[in-house]
């Protein structure tokens, strides 16, 4: 199975100070992962909003792409090809889930609010006793 990462999952993996960094990294090993232009651009936007320079954010993304070699897929579907988009809320998330579905994949996310059969919520870390 291949998982297309949404922006939240990619940011949590690449930003060590992110509150869900450990959660995503516990789920990550051994999985086949993919990114697309939307998730890459989203990472750059969020990393800069968190205080990174664009140059540093681009370097982090480039190192990830080089070292972890996720599958890259183009955004080759028109928005109108995503029948699951029925409201203005979550349009990008649903588009990404439909993009993954078109390839027989799932969308890896930290967002509990994505109502799509292909959206897989990355599980919480177990709480120690």
Label for each model-derived stretch:
Residues 1-35, 49-59:
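Short, well-structured N-terminal submotif of metal-dependent ribonuclease cores
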Residues 118-129:
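Active-site regions of enzymes building and remodeling cell-envelope glycoconjugates
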Residues 67-113:
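Active-site neighborhoods of divalent-metal-dependent phosphate/nucleic-acid chemistry enzymes
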Residues 39-40, 92:
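Short, conserved alpha-helical segments within structured domains
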Residues 4, 34-37, 72, 107-109:
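A structural signal for short, well-ordered beta-strand segments and their strand-loop junctions
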Residues 10, 40-43, 114-115:
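A generic structural signal for short hydrophobic patches within well-formed alpha-helices
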Residues 45-49, 101:
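Short glycine/serine- and small hydrophobic-enriched flexible loop segments
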């Amino acid at each position: 199975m291949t998982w297309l990462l949404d922006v939240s999952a990619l940011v949590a993996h690449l930003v060590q100070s992110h509150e869900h960094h450990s959660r995503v990294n516990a789920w990550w090993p051994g999985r086949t992962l993919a990114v697309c232009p939307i998730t890459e651009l989203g990472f750059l936007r969020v990393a800069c909003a968190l205080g990174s320079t664009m140059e540093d954010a681009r370097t982090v993304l480039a190192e990830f792409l080089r070292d972890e070699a996720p599958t890259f897929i183009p955004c080759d579907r028109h928005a109108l090809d995503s029948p699951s988009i029925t409201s203005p809320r979550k349009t990008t998330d649903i588009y990404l889930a439909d993009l993954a579905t078109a390839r027989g994949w799932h969308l890896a996310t930290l967002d509990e609010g994505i109502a799509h059969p292909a959206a897989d919520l990355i599980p919480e870390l177990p709480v120690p006793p």
